[in-house]
Amino acid sequence: MTIAITDVVLRDAHQSLFATRLRLDDMLPIAAALDDVGYGSLECWGGATFDACIRFLGEDPWLRLRELKKAMPKTPLQMLLRGQNLLGYRHYADDVVERFVERAVKNGMDVFRVFDAMNDPRNMKAALQAVRSHGAHAQGTLSYTTSPAHTLQTWLDLTEQLLETGVDSIAIKDMSGILTPMAAYELVSEIKKRFEVRLHLHCHATTGMAEMALLKAIEAGVDGVDTAISSMSATYGHPATEALVATLAGTEHDTGLDILKLENIAAYFREVRKKYHAFEGQLKGYDSRILVAQVPGGMLTNLESQLKQQNAADKLDQVLAEIPRVREDLGFIPLVTPTSQIVGTQAVLNVLTGERYKTIAKETAGILKGEYGHTPVPVNAALQARVLEGGAPVTCRPADLLKPELAELEADVRRQAQEKGITLAGNAIDDVLTVALFPQIGLKFLENRNNPAAFEPLPQAEAAQPVAKAEKPAASGIYTVEVEGKAFVVKVSDGGDISQLTAAVPAASSAPVQAAAPAGAGTPVTAPLAGNIWKVIATEGQTVAEGDVLLILEAMKMETEIRAAQAGTVRGIAVKSGDAVSVGDTLMTLA
């Protein structure tokens, strides 16, 4: 049986390797060559690409999809869809899910890999049904993980539930690289033995087991696998396409792909990747810590980046050790977007504040309340009681609690566009959906769609040289220099030669607040993380009780409620919505 290959170079490869920064201008020159290979599909959209396009790159993600479809008409295009979360970080009403899928199909999408971070089939149902109703390929997903709560029967039951919902195929998504070769063989064998379904396997290379897992799955009868072109593979990413093609050549599983065509593509990306060196993670080789922490590749690079922004890069090992503990408290949920971000952020909070759950992120509370769906086992009862505050957890499908919201969203976006003088796209619904998924970031993108200066600068293939070089450095050292407004970290040897040059971590979007509480004025309320003030809730002179929410901080793409550690009167509010703050900055005081 021939094995179908899905190459993830245009989506998950760069999401895992360099924080989803690959630009459309670096995709289109190689698109015709990719289209000529004969892949089963090309993953090129969804996941974090939508967010990255509008947050960092200043690209319209809908335009990206149309351009890729135009450039690659022969190969099915594939995306990753987060079920009821779509591409955002909350559940959306069914009418929004239906319209989003419709527009994705109209813009060129063929294959939808639909997953739910909780492995709750109820959260995948609306999206899967919408995909099939619009004539596209609906692929249900098992988000693979291990824990005392997960057995072979867990995956067989979920497979059966997805088949009852209605799917065209099923993917096993090993986002952390923890699927062992023998477990892959058993899982694929047992699913194939019991069900007539096309089966696909997605693995990450982070722990070093992915290539072996793919081979054992192929022996067991898997129909297709994900790989990435070699120059965009390995470490946080995926097994190399060429290696698997060569391995299977001449066997009953021969992929039929031409390795010379693949090598030309690899050569192209080998050069393109150099532009994005500033966003690369630190991993060299494999990382066995993932076998314990179960952190997906993309999450690991994001954690490194986010800890740098918090001036806490040295805390990575502590955070990795805390992640499994948080995961257990949250019912052994899988670590895949958005739960990976939620667990990671909570672990960072627990480490940086020096006290577990001193601060509970809004999204962590949502999982404890049941707002994201069923957890594999019950969550920590004490934590749940703390966030419920006497209320009851959600037990139904979370989206059943949501009223239709598309009409209201559309009216709101059109109103804001008129007020701000924004020209909406020809198909205005695409812009409406962009803002629906990312209200603040989406609106900012629409305001600056034709203003590249509002986004990250274009990546540079060649490292810039300092404007001036010290005539005679006193000794070797590491310095930060600014070149054309961009900061670079430079390592200078004893002889004055520059042996390393990388982009420095960007600063917060605006000048951080630097406020200090006057002596004796009360107890300062400080920022546990670096980020931006989302909303100030407390008012000057207000009397608050212990546990009352004072303000909401946006950090690491999550909203963190800052609560009063004691009863008191609010004095000296030092921040407003939109302000950037650093760790430890005083936000207000409680007298």
Curated annotation (Swiss-Prot):
It catalyses: oxaloacetate + 2 Na(+)(in) + H(+) = pyruvate + 2 Na(+)(out) + CO2. GO terms for molecular function: decarboxylation-driven active transmembrane transporter activity; oxaloacetate decarboxylase activity; pyruvate carboxylase activity. GO terms for biological process: sodium ion transport. Residues 3-263 form the Pyruvate carboxyltransferase domain. Keywords: Biotin, Ion transport, Sodium, Sodium transport, Translocase, Transport. Coiled coil: none annotated. Catalyzes the decarboxylation of oxaloacetate coupled to Na(+) translocation. Composed of three chains (alpha, beta, and gamma). This is Oxaloacetate decarboxylase alpha chain. It comes from Salmonella typhimurium (strain LT2 / SGSC1412 / ATCC 700720). The gene is oadA1.
